[in-house]
Amino acid sequence: MISKEKIARINELAQKAKSNTITDEEKAEQQKLRQEYLKGFRSSMKNTLKSVKVIDPEGNDVTPEKLKREQQKNNLH
């Protein structure tokens, strides 16, 4: 997970970009930080989805087969 300081820096750079006072160096830093943030977010989202079980209104397990295989591989369900 990305630190609070890095998130604050991302937001600071976003404000500078909105006011058109951002330098090329800061743009590169902003891109690097955004990529780091997105990588962590995607990883977290994948882990969350791996623990999901989908049940229809009749109580049947309708979890997609691909997800079931991934869960079995990781011994989650």
Swiss-Prot record:
Which Pfam families is this protein grouped with?
DUF896
Q: Extract the ranges annotated as region (Disordered).
A: 55-77
Keywords (alphabetical) are: Cytoplasm
User: Which is one Gene Ontology cellular component term of this protein?
Assistant: cytoplasm
- Which positions form S-S bridges? none
Q: Which residue intervals are annotated with compositional bias (Basic and acidic residues) in the record?
A: 63-77
Protein family: Belongs to the UPF0291 family.
Its name, as the record gives it, is UPF0291 protein RBAM_017680
Q: Whose protein is this, by species?
A: Bacillus velezensis (strain DSM 23117 / BGSC 10A6 / LMG 26770 / FZB42)
